[in-house]
Amino acid sequence: MNCRVAALLEKLRVQECTKSRPRRSNDNALAESKNGTVIRKHFGYGHIPGRQAERLHAFHRDVLAPHLNYHRPCYFPSEQVDARGRVRKRYRQQDIMTPCQKLRSLPGAADCLRPGIDFAQLDALAGACSDNEAARRLNQVRDKLFATIRAEQAGAA
């Protein structure tokens, strides 16, 4: 084996073991970053007993997911290729939108929706309350949920 082949193999080996690779989302890093920035922000880092899982799932499904999808703006990157051919991600002010707005902006997005769902229904969900009202509701329901969990844990102890 010559030096060039050895260098290529070494480069491949390092890429397979590295977890923080740009534009590679096929490993667990994407899920863990979501847990850190979205889930843990609202649920906290403390232990939550398994018997509370159904309540937390209902909160996530009925309150948190609609808030994130229809009312929380996100930056979406624009890719620009520089003179050397490297792809640069740029986060511009005009690229801020909710995930629902981003879905609508994609070509052929209507074909990706579930059967029986159209953008008029999604707009009705998004327009049911303002962004501030949705955030207020999220905080109220979350506080009530965790007060119930704390009361049950105190009663069980």
Language-model segments: residues:
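C-terminal non-catalytic accessory extensions
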Residues: L125-A157
